[in-house]
Amino acid sequence: MNSKFADELIATAKAIVAPGKGILAADESTNTIGARFKKINLENNEENRRAYRELLIGTGNGVNEFIGGIILYEETLYQKMADGRLFTDVLREQKIHIGIKVDKGVVPIPGTDGETSTQGLDGLAERCKKYYEAGARFAKWRAVLKIDLAKNCPSQLSITENAHTLARYAAICQENGLVPIVEPEILMDGNHTVEQSAEVTEKVLAAVFKALNDHHILLEGALLKPNMVVNGTDCPIKATSEQIGKFTVRTLQRTVPPALTGVVFLSGGQTEIEATANLNAMNVLPNRPWALSFSYGRALQASVISTWKGESANVEAARKVYLHRAKCNSLAQLGKYTGEESTGSASESLYVKDYKY
């Protein structure tokens, strides 16, 4: 890859996952944030979405020691604080890198059992240019795969198709100065064991990195956003944090080149505390040539939203909750998280069946 942006891409990727730092994924689509607001009986309109994102973006108090990047939805990229400052300017002042979700959602692959491919390659180069000009320095694209061993899912067709589109997206991003976050999410839905999850995740990641190599992706200027290796939600045997850490790190060791700067895990419907504890379990293990960090949406925001409740009087209390969760995950990224009291919302299941983002 001979992009004029090579040095910048490498520096950005390193900064996002510097020691103790990870990503806040705040790029929920309008429909998804609507579902979150519904839980607190809040109308899903542009002003409420703006106010909620101001709560997150306006959090100071050293949040930038824990958060290296924040992924925004396109609407948010152009929104402003109540005092008129652009969200992007506030983030730049805090030296938090700005990311943007660039995929257009999933569509079924014909001839499969409901398996999907991600749309959004058309016009992507132009959009990347526009986002770079608006201050974005990284992007995210989510592919979705599911495990159903009885139906032979994920099929080879689904794996190949999603690996290819992830690699095309990554190449277009790097050409235009954006660090690509490559996200092949294998959903938690199903009754598979943690061992079966490890086997499938290995197969998927091997295909993804073969495609990235075929497309000449600069791995030092890219980040991987995979699922942790966990058992299916309907599996009677629940894996421990230690097992999840061990199987996840082993899977990465077998498939991910050490040239890749970092791996930022999705929380995928784990509780807030599970997502933190499982990340910590990986970071106490040996032989990790990459930064292993977080790119959490629900697992950084669920308690924040339930504390806020849409009331301006609760903004500061909600920001304290956000800071606390960010700090816990920062400690986990360093392998120094020692646990915490499980308050109601922090240990509440965040699982949504067949999760659409």
From Swiss-Prot:
The active site is at E183, K225. One of its GO terms (molecular function) is fructose-bisphosphate aldolase activity. GO terms for biological process: fructose 1,6-bisphosphate metabolic process; fructose metabolic process; glycolytic process. The keyword Iron-sulfur does not apply. SUPFAM superfamilies: Aldolase. Pathway: Carbohydrate degradation; glycolysis; D-glyceraldehyde 3-phosphate and glycerone phosphate from D-glucose: step 4/4. One of its GO terms (cellular component) is extracellular matrix. The keyword Lyase applies. It catalyses: beta-D-fructose 1,6-bisphosphate = D-glyceraldehyde 3-phosphate + dihydroxyacetone phosphate. It comes from the Eukaryota. Disulfide bonds: none annotated. Keywords: Glycolysis, Lyase, Schiff base. Substrate binds at R49, K140. Belongs to the class I fructose-bisphosphate aldolase family. PANTHER family: FRUCTOSE-BISPHOSPHATE ALDOLASE. This is Fructose-bisphosphate aldolase. The gene is fba.
